[in-house]
């Protein structure tokens, strides 16, 4: 299948300057980015197509080769005039072969992409479970609004480096071998700024604290990262910006412990409710619900409230809330209450029914068997 024309992909004229090309690419990248169009193969393909077109047309040498030879001039799998891929001489060929050994092949030096940034965001459990929008402030480097990222004073432009002719690299030949290194004149940039911008001092970028609104999806957990494409540091001299990664950390909750999509909590139960049964109020993230406690409930028994956990960020399935019963021993008893408990104990012990204390009776019977085995 034949490739589309790069200028047609970006929707610009063949005479478009760097700024117009960059603006067109940004518009398409925002429109078709995979993060904005999940599970949409067509958008992903258009995003890749626009990215490829921008990578060629934003590079002066590659653009010149494309304008002259079309796709064959920039596709390494297609040979250009002379059979060496775009009319390369033997110096180019040997430089590509041996240059990797001595510091990189002879390639066009592109302006560096902006650095990625990380922002640590702390959320409450409720925010993580339900989702939330947060406004954050991020100190970063942004494109200079006076020179529009060129680094040159308004009305002027950067000049092609006379030493490396815009490649950003020079070759030092030692017999058969060619060693490639960064151009010492332009420091690998390929361009010289003779009249730098007064605001950014030739860097093309300035320090600024950006205010961003971040939408946190429901179901995130500690360790999850949210990528904001193009919100990192601005690239050098019009190169693409880096990305911003929001690192999520969920604070400890006073009641609930999260494990995956399930929540866990302990519910205190009076010893009378545990013995006779009843209902207790149980907290959930959606409000309180009443839980029926069966008779003879012991500490450690788990009760599952289905669908009261966390909705999965990926599958949408709802987790459960698991409640562990903790039978409370009454404290600060009056003399009358203590006497009543003693009467109850005497009644239980004198009934001859072992099932009144199943765990205690089982424990002491096990201890007796253990010592009988030792002495027998």
Swiss-Prot record:
Zn(2+) 1 binds at residues 144, 147, 197, 200. GO terms for molecular function: ATP binding; heat shock protein binding; unfolded protein binding; zinc ion binding. Its cofactor is Zn(2+). CDD domains: DnaJ (cd06257), DnaJ_C (cd10747), DnaJ_zf (cd10719). Keywords: Chaperone, Cytoplasm, DNA replication, Metal-binding, Repeat, Stress response, Zinc, Zinc-finger. The keyword Membrane does not apply. CXXCXGXG motif repeats lie at residues 144-151, 161-168, 183-190, 197-204. Pfam families: DnaJ (PF00226), DnaJ_C (PF01556), DnaJ_CXXCXGXG (PF00684). PROSITE patterns: DNAJ_1, DNAJ_2, ZF_CR. A zinc finger (CR-type) spans 131-209. Residues 5-70 form the J domain. PANTHER family: CHAPERONE PROTEIN DNAJ (PTHR43096:SF48), DNAJ HOMOLOG 1, MITOCHONDRIAL-RELATED (PTHR43096). This is Chaperone protein DnaJ. It comes from Tolumonas auensis (strain DSM 9187 / NBRC 110442 / TA 4).
